[in-house]
């Protein structure tokens, strides 16, 4: 069994073990990390990156710890999964406060390879949320548009230095993510579009005051 198969089996068991289902559809949660891993695979990701994509929500959402990932999959996979895991806790404040805690942690911890996984995660989540919950999408899309600017603008994204140096322009997944978010925003009813725009502006202003 290779590392990707092992990661998929482990993640499926971890998410099932806490009864986690995919929001809106009720399908087994593993469908999401499998979809994220497939996006990473088609983007040329290494086996370790694909395994980390399979595992990216295990520390955050299940009983799995960093040490479990480290012992079973090695330091590189564990490092990426940890970097991708939200750090904010419910007691850290309201949604905005927790959002900024997570953004700051992602900005500090993501590297070129884990940024690929984060973009894949954003793409798959955006497609699901805009399909099933337009009201929440106004909030969600504002946050993702903000994250695309803060986490990925001018950042290194890719499998290796060689790939980045040989690639003209932005990483294809960044282009895809920006297009998906922009298209989803354009498809919102006018009232929700302007609500999302106001949220984005407020996040940008608050972030600027925190720097």
Stretch-by-stretch model annotation:
Residues 1-211:
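Active-site helical microenvironments for divalent-metal-assisted chemistry
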């Amino acid at each position: 069994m290779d590392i990707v198969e092992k990661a998929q089996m482990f993640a499926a068991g971890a998410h099932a073990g806490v009864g986690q289902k995919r929001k809106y559809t009720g399908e087994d949660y593993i469908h999401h990390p499998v979809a994220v891993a497939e996006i990473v695979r088609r983007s040329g990701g290494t086996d370790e990156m694909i395994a980390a994509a399979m595992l990216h929500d295990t520390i955050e959402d299940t009983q799995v710890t960093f040490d479990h990932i480290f012992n079973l999959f090695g330091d590189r996979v564990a490092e990426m999964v940890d970097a991708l895991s939200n750090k904010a806790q419910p007691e850290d404040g309201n949604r905005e406060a927790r959002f900024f805690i997570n953004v700051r942690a992602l900005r500090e911890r993501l590297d070129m390879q884990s940024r690929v996984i984060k973009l894949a995660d954003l793409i798959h989540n955006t497609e699901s949320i805009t399909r099933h919950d337009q009201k929440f999408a106004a909030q969600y899309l504002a946050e993702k548009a903000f994250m695309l600017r803060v986490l990925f603008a001018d950042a290194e994204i890719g499998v290796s230095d060689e790939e980045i140096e040989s690639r003209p322009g932005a990483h294809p997944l960044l282009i895809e993510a920006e297009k998906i978010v922009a298209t989803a925003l354009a498809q919102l009813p006018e009232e929700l579009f302007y609500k999302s725009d106001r949220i984005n502006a407020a996040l940008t202003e608050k972030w600027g005051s925190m720097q």
